[in-house]
């Protein structure tokens, strides 16, 4: 048989066995010798991808590896493979955390197994069912889907299945459906025991990565960061820096470090993880990476880059058919627009989310985040009481779910809305309680990125006398560090923001703003500018929206800081 070799492989050195095996794999696939091809693929291309073997090809291996993987997978997908080969492909994809590819292979197996020997199909079918359940637990956030998958895994566990992968999947599934008693009943894996084979090695990475998420939800950030860092180091050692497994751990670690205020070097960590996610990662890893990259850009005042990042996230979500990621990306865009005072554009983003597939309506976490975004929009458009009502509903719904981090974020936003409504006593009490929780946990960015009313109260608390018993003394250093970080971010973002606001304010709004700075009422401003009081009121509302403020005093102070007066 004449085998045509890919020209990319002809640049490899003769001694490089993996490249020759890749060529053989291509040839046997073209000749329909699928079992031989699968064996060659297992020995060569998958090993190269898993180990990120840069010596397998001359020069920079990444373009060649990408081209080879694309060609081989396209050939394999168009060729009828045996059921066992399909299961092996699904298993290999699971090991590398290519969830969508693994599910596709399982689905193809189920189609092919109907033509296979009945006994072989039955045995393989049981294994495929467990494999599908593992994949769905890792991928899905829908409670009904996860519960159905857990039923399969529990049956396997009762029949003697004790693998680390099964244990990790059970714990992940129980936490997702909020069955906390069963979650804690399943023993934790001993992550200190080294293991390097198959999904056992995967379990020692994905397991602690998910446990880091759980610890973060419990506001034990130090423990969470330690688990995520250990999982990331193990993933880099086992799979290399640019693999979906490493990206999962890197995304969790990056979000934890950002919340703790440790932002140095995060760009590089996130960019490495996104390089893997763009080709074969999962939507959770992608969302974590894009979320951190967006917040880092906004933190340094580079909103143009932040919007470009979100655009790439939306394009990837559309290409990979990830409606959950599309919704989350649009919510991030809406929050960024609200920070710039662009409430109309933010409202359009939220409306786009509501047109996404109906299955998202059963995603409780996504619906809660959407309600959170709607409340932020209401607060930004002067409807603080309606916003406070939504935040209270979210706070009530979060009780019993053991996600203290989410509850803390709601409390901070609720305090901001109440302060804007004039409910200073309740708003202050909620904020002080949130500060006590945040100080113990080491939370920073949640308060640094809080609304203007919270910032003003933090400033007031910081300058209160030591005799002020309403503020616990241990909170003073914590508040000081939050205000210091907020001041640094303000200094970075003010020039760009001042330019945008200056361009957006009309000449008449400038005139009204200058009159407001002199303490004039709407009636006096109307007389001075010879316009109707209703027109002044409309201009004041436009100024509030463009400056992203909620009171006249805050509008004047913000305009002064931006150099508009």
Regions found by a protein language model. Give the residues of each.
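Alpha-solenoid helical repeat architecture
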Residues: 37-42, 77-86, 117-131, 158-172, ...
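Amphipathic alpha-helical segments of tetratricopeptide repeats
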Residues: 69-74, 107-117, 150-159, 190-197, ...
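Residue at a conserved register position within TPR or TPR-like alpha-solenoid repeats
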Residues: 93, 136, 174-176, 215, ...
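Structural motif corresponding to the intra-repeat A-B loop/turn of tetratricopeptide repeats
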Residues: 96, 139-140, 177-179, 218, ...
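TPR-repeat structural position
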Residues: 99, 142-143, 180-182, 221, ...
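Single-residue signature of alpha-solenoid repeat helices
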Residues: 102, 146, 183-185, 224, ...
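Linker/hinge segments immediately adjacent to helix-turn-helix/homeobox DNA-binding domains
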Residues: 404, 430, 435-507, 514, ...
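Helix-turn-helix DNA-binding segment
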Residues: 491-550, 554-565
């Amino acid at each position: 048989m004449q085998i045509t070799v890919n020209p990319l492989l002809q640049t490899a050195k003769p001694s490089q066995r993996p490249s020759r095996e890749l060529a053989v794999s291509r040839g046997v696939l073209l000749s329909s010798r699928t079992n031989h091809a699968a064996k060659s693929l297992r020995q060569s291309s998958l090993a190269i991808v898993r180990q990120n073997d840069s010596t397998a090809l001359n020069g920079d291996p990444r373009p060649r590896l990408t081209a080879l993987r694309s060609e081989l997978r396209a050939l394999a997908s168009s060729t009828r493979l045996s059921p066992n080969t399909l299961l092996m492909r699904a298993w290999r994809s699971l090991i590398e955390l290519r969830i969508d590819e693994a599910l596709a292979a399982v689905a193809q197996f189920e189609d092919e197994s109907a033509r296979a020997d009945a006994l072989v199909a039955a045995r393989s079918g049981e294994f495929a069912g467990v494999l599908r359940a593992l994949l769905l637990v890792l991928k899905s956030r829908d409670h009904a889907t996860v519960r159905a998958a857990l039923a399969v895994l529990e049956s396997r566990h009762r029949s003697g299945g004790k693998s680390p992968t099964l244990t990790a999947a059970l714990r992940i599934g129980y936490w997702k459906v909020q069955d906390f008693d069963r979650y804690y009943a399943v023993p934790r894996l001993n992550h200190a025991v080294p293991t390097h084979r198959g999904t056992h090695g995967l379990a020692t990475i994905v397991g602690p990565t998910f446990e880091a998420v759980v610890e973060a939800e419990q506001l034990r950030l130090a423990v969470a960061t330690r688990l995520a860092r250990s999982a990331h180091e193990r993933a880099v050692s086992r799979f290399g820096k640019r693999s979906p497994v490493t990206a999962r751990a890197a995304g969790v670690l990056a979000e934890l470090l950002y919340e703790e205020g440790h932002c140095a070097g995060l760009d590089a960590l996130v960019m490495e993880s996104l390089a893997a996610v763009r080709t074969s990662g999962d939507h959770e890893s992608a969302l974590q990476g894009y979320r951190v990259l967006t917040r880092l850009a906004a933190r340094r005042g580079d909103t143009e880059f932040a919007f470009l990042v979100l655009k790439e996230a939306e394009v990837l979500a559309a290409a990979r058919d990830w409606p959950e990621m599309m919704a989350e990306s649009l919510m991030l865009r809406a929050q960024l627009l609200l920070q710039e005072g662009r409430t109309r554009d933010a409202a359009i983003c939220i409306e786009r989310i509501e047109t996404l597939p109906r299955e998202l309506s059963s995603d409780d976490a996504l619906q809660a985040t959407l309600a959170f975004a709607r409340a932020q929009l209401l607060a930004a458009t002067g409807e603080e009481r309606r916003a406070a009502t939504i935040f209270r509903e979210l706070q009530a719904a979060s009780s019993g779910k053991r996600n203290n981090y989410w509850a803390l974020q709601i409390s901070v936003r609720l305090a901001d809305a109440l302060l804007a409504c004039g409910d200073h006593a309740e708003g202050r009490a909620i904020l002080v309680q949130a500060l006590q929780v945040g100080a113990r946990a080491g939370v920073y960015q949640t308060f640094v990125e809080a609304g203007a009313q919270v910032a003003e109260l933090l400033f007031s608390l910081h300058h209160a006398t030591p005799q002020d018993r309403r503020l616990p003394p241990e909170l003073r250093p914590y508040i000081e560090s939050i205000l210091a970080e907020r001041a640094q971010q303000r200094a970075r973002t003010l020039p760009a923001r001042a330019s945008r606001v200056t361009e957006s304010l009309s000449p008449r709004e400038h005139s009204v703003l200058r009159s407001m700075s002199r303490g004039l009422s709407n009636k006096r401003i109307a007389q001075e500018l010879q316009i109707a009081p209703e027109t002044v009121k409309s201009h004041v509302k436009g100024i509030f929206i463009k400056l992203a403020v909620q009171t006249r005093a805050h509008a004047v102070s913000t305009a002064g800081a931006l150099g508009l007066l």
